[in-house]
Amino acid sequence: DPGPQMVRMWVDRSHFKPYPATVQRLLPVEIGELNRLYQLGFASWLPATAIADGVYYGMRVNGRLVAAAGTHVISHAARLAVVGNVLTHMDYRGRGFATAVTGAVTAELLRSCDQVVLNVRADNPPAINAYRHLGYSEHARFEERLIHRLGPPWADLTAPLRRVNALRKLLLERRADLVLGDDRGGRRDAGAHP
């Protein structure tokens, strides 16, 4: 199924432009509040481990979480991270909140990663401009698509293994027949002599 056109953007330490703002590092105990915010735009829930294992920052107005950004993936081995889950409550858009929380997440990630990337819908110029303000630049454009699986998830991988195991079993049986002295099609007769 066709999906939205997306823009992959990236930044490294030399191009990153910090955005001064008062933001807060989110803690796993705040997952309920974060998920309530995300329900306004994503309709998905994150487990508390997403915050514990990732980097999430939020912005509050009168104690209420109104903007947040976090991570999809952090690879310390590849020194690469992917920012995601950026959302600002509809009533607070256009005030730089998404830039602030994305900037805080990016700054922390660039302490241990050489590059940080993110994906954004091509039809979202305010978000693209916010990321450019932080030093992100366009790397590629692509189309996101939904893929429908036609069979069990591992069928393509397990079918060859099943064939190899069946062949192995057949070869072991044939080998046993030869060891017992029966080469007449796999029948064993322990009392027969050549």
Where are these regions (language model features)?
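Conserved active-site alpha-helix within GNAT-family acetyltransferase domains
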Residues: 1, 99, 122-140
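Acyl-donor-binding surface of acyltransferase catalytic domains
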Residues: 1-20
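A short beta-loop-alpha structural element at the N-terminal edge
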Residues: 22-33
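A conserved beta-strand-loop-helix scaffold within acyl/acetyltransferase catalytic domains
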Residues: 45-56, 60-87
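Conserved acetyl-CoA-binding loop-helix of GNAT-fold acetyltransferases
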Residues: 88, 94-110, 128-133
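Conserved GNAT acetyl-CoA-binding A-motif
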Residues: 109-119
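Conserved beta-strand-loop-alpha-helix junction that forms the acyl-donor binding cleft
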Residues: 117-128, 144-156
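Short linear motifs in low-complexity or flexible loops
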Residues: 190-192
